[in-house]
Structure formats: C-alpha cells, structure tokens
Amino acid sequence: MPVITLPDGSQRSFSNPVTVMQVAEDIGPGLAKATVAGRIDGQLVDACELISDDAKLSIITGKDPEGVEIIRHSFAHLVGHAVKQLYPTAQMAIGPVIDEGFYYDIAYERPFTPDDLAAIEKRIAELVKTDYDVVKRMTPIAEARQQFVDRGESYKVALIDDMDESTKEVGLYYHEEYMDMCRGPHVPNTRVLRHFKLMKLAGAYWRGDSNNEMLQRIYGTAWNDKKELKGYLTRIEEAEKRDHRKLGKKLDLFHVQEEAPGMVFWHPKGWRLYQAVEQYMRQKQLDNNYQEVKTPQIVDRVLWEKSGHWGKYHENMFTTHSENRDYAVKPMNCPCHIQVYNQGLKSYRDLPFRMAEFGSCHRNEPSGALHGIMRVRNFVQDDGHIFVTEGQIQQEVSEFIDLLHEVYADFGFDNIVYRLSTRPEQRVGSDEVWDKAEKALSEALDSAGLDWEELPGEGAFYGPKIEFSLKDAIGRVWQCGTIQVDFSMPTRLGAQYVSEDGSRQTPVMLHRAIVGSLERFIGILIEDTEGAFPVWLAPEQVVIMNITDRQADYCSVLEKRLNSNGFRAKLDLRNEKIGFKIREHTLQRVPYMIVVGDKEVEQEQVAVRTRTGEDLGVMSISDFEGLLQQEIARRSRKQEVEIVL
C-alpha cells in the first residue's frame, strides 16, 4: 500500500500501486488535466509511471520549467507525426529540446520549402485538437530495432546500434500510427500541446559531421500558454530588427563573404568602431599595470604538444607545413605568453605579473556554426594572463572583477550574470589546491557583494573559473568575460619563480578576458544599441551639412577643425535637399548633425540637432566642441545635452 508524500508535506495512501496520473486525479480533475509528467523521489518520469512503494511525488505541469521542456520535446514528436503523414517517405533522425524550443532533423528526397513548413504546422495544429493519448511502451531493444527496420527508419536503427550493450530495452512513444523512440518523459495527451510555432528550416549534417549526409532541420518553439508564446515571438521579431548582420550592412560597418568564411572584412566606419573599443581596452589595461605584448601567429607543433593543445584541440587548429616542420596558427595566446614570462627568471617580488595581448586567434569552427561576427574563425581577444602565487589568487580576482565592472558600465551594461564553475571529475592538481582556488574565487565574488550561481563539475580540467555574462536590452544573455585558474600549463611549459626562501616554485596562471572576442563583443554592442552607439564609440560622431554651395568652404573648415581636435567628423556637401541629408544621417545613427546656412556662416556659428530629432539651436563651434567632449567623457548611452553658453 504506497504512501505518497506531496511537496507540501501532505500524504495520500493507496490500497494498490498507482500511476502519477492517478494520484493527480485523486487530488483533483483540474490538476489531472494539466499534468504533464511527475517527479518520483527526484527523478522525472512519465505520467503513466507506476508507483508501487512509498515515495515523494511532485506533479509536473506546464507551469514548471521541466514541464515546458517536456511540452517542447513532445512537440518535436508531433513534427515527426505530421511529417510522416504528409511525406511518408521521409526518415526521422533526432528531435531534441533546445533553448526556448526544439528541432527535428529529417531526411527527405527534396528540400522542404516555406510552403511545406506551413503545411506541417497546419497538420500539427489539426493533430493536437484531436486530444489523443500518447502511449509509452518499454520495448526490448531487438524488437524496437526490428520495428524501425520495418518502417524504413534507418537513422533510428543507427541510433539503436550505437547504444551500449547493457541497454536491454528502450522507450517507444506512440502518437496514433506514428512511433518514435525516446527516454522521455513525454506528455500523456495532446490536450496540453497547444501553443507552438514552427520557426524556420535549416540544414544539418547527420551526427554533426560534415562527412555525413546533409539533413533538413525544422526548428520550432512551444510554450505553456498563449501569452508566453506571443512574448517570445515579439522578442524574436525585436532580435531580427537588431540583427548585427543586417545592421552591419545597413550602417556600412563590415561584411563577410564566401571566399573567407568566418573572417571579417571591416569597412572604414566599422574599423573606427573596432579601434575605439580596442584603444579603450588598451588604456584600461595600462591603467591597471598590465604589460602589453605581441606574440607570433604561427608556432611549431612542439609547443602545442607541450601545452596539450595538439592532442586535445588539433582538429580545431589551422595547420601548415614548411621545411619538414609542422606549424599551427595559434587558436589561443596562453602558451605564447608563458614563453614571454620564461625569458628571465622571476622572483616572488615580480608577482603578480600581468600580461596582455590583443591576440589574433584562428579556430577552425564548423561552417554551419558561423554567424556573422558573433561566431567566427578569426578573432581578436582582449587576452590577459596573470602569474601569481596561490596566496595572491583572491586579491587578483577581486581586482579583476572591479576592472570588469568599470568596463561593462562604460559600455552601458549593468545587468551581469555570474557563474562559478567548480572541479570536474577529471582534473589535475590536488584536492587541497582546488579547495584553495575555489574558495578564493567564491570569496572574491562574495566580497564584491555579488549574487552568483555555482555550476558543480563544470570547471576546466586545469582549474575552476568564473564566467561573466551580459543581459542585453531585450533580455538575451551573452557570455563575455572569464577568469580561469590554471594549475597545469605553467608546469607543462616550465614556468617558475624564486620564492622568498630561495626555492624554485611554479606560479599559478590566471587566464582572463573582459570583452572576450572583440568581434563578438562589437556584434553584441550593435544589437544592444540597435546601431545607435554612444557618442564616444560612434564611428561618425558628427556630420556637417551645407544647405547650398555658398556654405561649402565654411563647412570644410569646420570638418578640418573637428577632426584635428580628435573628433570623428564627416562632411556632406552633396547637392541634395537638407531634409534628405538629415533623414539619411539619422538613419545612419550619427549622434549629432550640424546644419550650416548663410546665417551660420555670417555669424561663425553652427545649428545643431541630434539623431533623435532634438533641435539644440545655434551655438559657436567652441561650445559644440565642449558639448561633444562632455558626452565623450561621460560615456553615457543617453544623449543628455547640457549647454552652457
């Protein structure tokens, strides 16, 4: 007679074994109707799971995060159900849940079209309205394999053949005539599957291997209620408006092309933006006692073998061969920085030893993973490495966090997510050293008064790390900064220092970055600001426009003066109406526009307006320069103009 303990501590006794759904029905019909799955003694199970012994039970509904994931997974099966009805010869591969949605990879004799996607979505909507039961059957693996063979589902057969020999049975889920394989859980009935949208079509290699056949991927999203779905679709629409690839073209910042996949062609305006970010970071590092270095792009494989990268990372490295030697284009800077550190024996008095480089790295990312300037093969990092003693870790991490906050604030980011990743099962170094490092990182976060999340087991094999992620204007989270403790590489590459007692010791190395990839960070800035950069970052801070040719010479004098004084000014003397020019430069997000007519020439003044349409009136060029300087010094995203004449 099982006794079921519910989350509120109440108990219910049953005379016979019961399913999760039967417990929900015993509590009330409303809960039963909303039930998606259950959690028995901490383990997620299907609603049909039988409970024979005393247990703790939570009923999972669509209001629970796990419930939403189950709804999404079940919608992936519905994609399979609909596709097989509409395109019987299609073969289903895999259909997992992803962040805020799901996808299904499918093999079919021709490419799916947008019309096909609409037809599949329509069929899914028809299927869910029938409120059919989803039936789970645990099936011996040989029998399940034969069923997929009989149905011509070669990808499912391949998945079964890859299973561990200890696997005796698999879960088969039946959506009426459609059958799919999954460990589950899945919804008990399609009545809880209502709010969804198929989003797009894409290509994907089977098993993610470019040597395998290309499949077709159908992406979708699903939510517990209509409001959540609408909110998501609104966020997606807003994200598309802010897409850095579209804005990069519209604002003439950069482009990428097939002849150099994953590598950026920076245009003049984009390169000015890039340089503004780099020069700002360079000055910040100099102000915080980092020594900037420059290390080679191509290094003999011997160094990469010593560092461990050749064995663990070789497939992602670009390599070359010359004069019977193998080389790799560096995918990261750390081994080279240790070579700089090793030039001349260091004393404990030299530590902490802070080194920085705007290092150009190349990584052979899969072509399908490339995305504008957010995911590239060639990128530059604000890379830094700090060599410390074990006792210096916490202080250095605390100072790094302070610096990171200054930088993010200047770029307009104040919503930061902090995650501490701790020791994995496979690691180097003693537990005692890991204890010290993890304690140092956590205390640095605590001393800064930060709320942070621990990710057990997610640290690198060589040490724990803190990751810093930014939330942008529409709530998306971007991982940017990091600081990682490394016990391994200094030992592998022979880094040492002379301790206070005269003995040779190995320093701990802290890998750190604040913006990370400059390309990716600029992509984030573009999307977060929608291209309306704060004045200090704007590629063009002011544009000077004449009304007629009579003002051309005066405009040229103004442009030369502003550029000579360190501002980024542009001259527009085109024979166009002034309203047309203003509109064009407003769309180009230029912060300030100077309009010059005969009156301004006569009085040696300028008429100023902002990209938001605010008319600031007429002022001297000196006053305008003061206004610009004030905006640049404040580094605020908001144009708050205070004019003192």
Swiss-Prot record:
Assigned EC number: 6.1.1.3
Superkingdom classification of source: Bacteria
Cofactor field: Zn(2+)
Positions with a binding annotation for Zn(2+): 334, 385, 511
Keywords (A to Z) from UniProt: Aminoacyl-tRNA synthetase, ATP-binding, Cytoplasm, Ligase, Metal-binding, Nucleotide-binding, Protein biosynthesis, RNA-binding, tRNA-binding, Zinc
Leading EC class: ligase
Alphabetical list of Pfam families matching this protein: HGTP_anticodon (PF03129), TGS (PF02824), tRNA-synt_2b (PF00587), tRNA_SAD (PF07973)
Main subcellular location of this protein, as a coarse class: cytoplasm
Sequence ranges assigned to domain TGS in this UniProt record: 1-61
A Gene Ontology molecular function term of the record: metal ion binding
GO biological process, one term: threonyl-tRNA aminoacylation
Catalytic activity: tRNA(Thr) + L-threonine + ATP = L-threonyl-tRNA(Thr) + AMP + diphosphate + H(+)
GO cellular component, one term: cytosol
Region Catalytic: start-end pairs: 243-534
Entry's family note: Belongs to the class-II aminoacyl-tRNA synthetase family.
Subunit relationships: Homodimer.
Role this protein plays: Catalyzes the attachment of threonine to tRNA(Thr) in a two-step reaction: L-threonine is first activated by ATP to form Thr-AMP and then transferred to the acceptor end of tRNA(Thr). Also edits incorrectly charged L-seryl-tRNA(Thr).
Protein name: Threonine--tRNA ligase
Taxonomic classification: Bacteria, Pseudomonadati, Pseudomonadota, Gammaproteobacteria, Oceanospirillales
Gene that this sequence comes from: thrS
